[in-house]
């Protein structure tokens, strides 16, 4: 995906965006698009390897992304993720809750 392929343009330069459920199809595409707009992206997913795959793709394309394992039903895990995001990317500007369950 390239910036010219996006159906929208928005300046997210240096904004920190956190996306839960980022290892899935929809949120991983969203993460890539947001990174192309200049955001630093934290990809959270229950399966770390899924989030890491997409974070690696974003970083390989010149973006800035980190992957973190998180179960959104566990507050302590989310608090740990928040601290890591602050440490690596800075304060969160945008949160996209894409994690779901059944």
Task: Name each model feature, range by range.
Residues 1-9:
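A short, basic/flexible loop-to-alpha-helix module at the beginning of a structural domain
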Residues 55, 59, 65-69, 74-90:
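Conserved amphipathic alpha-helix within the SDR
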Residues 16, 40, 64-66, 91-93:
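Structural signature of beta-strand start/N-cap positions in the alpha/beta core
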Residues 12, 26, 51-54, 58:
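Generic hydrophobic, amphipathic alpha-helix propensity
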Residues 37-54:
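Conserved glycine-rich Rossmann-like NAD(P)H-binding loop of the short-chain dehydrogenase/reductase
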Residues 8-42:
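Canonical Rossmann dinucleotide-binding motif of NAD(H)/NADP(H)-dependent dehydrogenases/reductases
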Residues 20, 92-100:
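Rossmann-fold scaffold of SDR-type NAD(P)-dependent oxidoreductases
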């Amino acid at each position: 995906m390239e910036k010219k392929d996006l159906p929208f343009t928005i300046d997210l330069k240096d904004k920190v965006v956190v996306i839960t459920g980022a290892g899935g199809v929809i949120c991983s595409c969203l993460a890539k698009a947001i990174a192309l707009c200049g955001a630093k992206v934290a990809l959270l997913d229950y399966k770390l390897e899924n989030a890491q795959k997409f974070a690696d793709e974003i970083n390989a394309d010149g973006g800035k992304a980190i992957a973190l394992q998180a179960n959104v039903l566990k507050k302590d895990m989310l608090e740990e993720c928040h601290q890591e995001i602050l440490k690596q990317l800075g304060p969160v500007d945008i949160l996209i809750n894409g994690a779901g369950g059944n």
